Amino acid sequence: MLIFAWLLTFSAPGAGLEAVSSAELCGDCHRAIHETWKASRHAHAMDSRLFQDVLHWTEADLGAAARRTCLGCHAPLALEIGDLTLQKKVSWEGVTCDYCHSVREVFMAAPNPKAKLKFDRMKTGPWKEADPGKHGAIFSDVHTSSQICAPCHEYRNALGFPVLTTFSEWKASRYAKEGRPCQSCHMPRVEHGGAARLVGATLLGAERHRQCEFCHAASAAGDVVEQRARRSSAAKSNLRDMVNLHEMKGSHSIEQLTSAIKAQLEAAREGNKLKVTVAVANVAAGHYVPTGSPLRQLVLEIRADTGGGKHFREERVYRRTVVDQQAKPVEREHIAFVKGVTAISDTRLAPDEKRSETFLFDVPPGDQTEIKAIFWYYYSPLATTESQKRVTFLTLSRLVQ
């Protein structure tokens, strides 16, 4: 009999559809934030093709009850309003504004972190001086810390297996000791105008956005709170100069991956062998790489192509290998969430970890060889398109005589 540990949030009694707000309402005033959020993985946590496929397989393999485990983090408001069949538009907004900004506390007690929610006109956030105008605001220490992320990025299943460990990976790293929460990398702060410029450059491309900004730069300062809302609250307080970006860039971002993983490629002759060495390091991720779903992988692929027509291929794979109660390797995410019992190996890169990978190829002297080291991030075996399955983010090359 399977037991599902899905209660990652709890709210005050009486939460219903009338108590929650759509992100579109928030976007009336918080335009730039809304635009960046709409392009984020949080906004598409529910409607992504990959998640839809996984949800289908979850119900087919594990029954309808398992659906709640998935929706708890991919459509949290659906659980709050009891819309398990996803009939309401707000249920399709993924991790939406009114979820995160209704969190009042996060309880870290075992087995899983839980968020306490309260849906009303008072919205929680990381700014003591916030005065949005249309609704009340409460400063929340939780929103300045990594704890706000923990209920969905730390999860132990009913069998005791730690399926998601991103929060605890961060907690054990120097980033936690230095007071650098998840937001410092995934929700960096910019000036008011900087948010508008980033939105424009993201949606239009940098060159087209510069053309727009030539005339519209004067209005950029009003990007975070829409001008009429800004004017209504200007007499009450001086609005802050900084705002957290809501793109929440992570492993689907080439920028984040290339920032986190650095590598050097060397090649030298050793008799009739060609020795290839790749130094690889996790230099900027405050958690393991990869993190999140236990089936994700970081793959280093080495290609050696000789002038004589020989082609060599080798790989190093950085991953967790999860097994079920029959010691059978788990090959689907939803099975890992429910039936995973242990990781029999873990070759991922810890924060600040450096490794040297060595490869030997049978290439005689004088046979010119092109060496390539290709890093790609593998997301899911259930992905139906190549872009959902993996992304190549770093390629190094060297020509050896």
Cite the ranges covered by each PLM segment.
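Bacterial N-terminal signal peptides
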Residues: M1-T9
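Sequence context of c-type cytochrome heme-c attachment sites
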Residues: L8-K177, M187, L198-G200
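Short, conserved sequence motifs used for protein processing/export or organelle targeting and
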Residues: N157, R189-Q401
